């Protein structure tokens, strides 16, 4: 999942939990973690 930016409900982290979507965005050096049950 490649995003233009990490959404406000998401956060930048080197490791996301299994309940989250692992995404990439230019404003995160590592991963952008987004809760899988959220609409964004």
Swiss-Prot record:
Keywords: Disulfide bond, Pyrrolidone carboxylic acid. Transmembrane segments: none annotated. Disulfide bonds join 6-33, 12-28, 16-32. Pfam families: Meleagrin. The keyword ATP-binding does not apply. The modification Pyrrolidone carboxylic acid is found at residue 1. Belongs to the transferrin family. This is Meleagrin.
């Amino acid at each position: 999942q490649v995003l233009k930016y990490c959404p406000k409900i998401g956060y930048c982290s080197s490791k996301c939990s299994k309940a989250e979507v692992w995404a990439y965005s230019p404003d995160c050096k590592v991963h952008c973690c987004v809760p899988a049950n959220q609409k964004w």
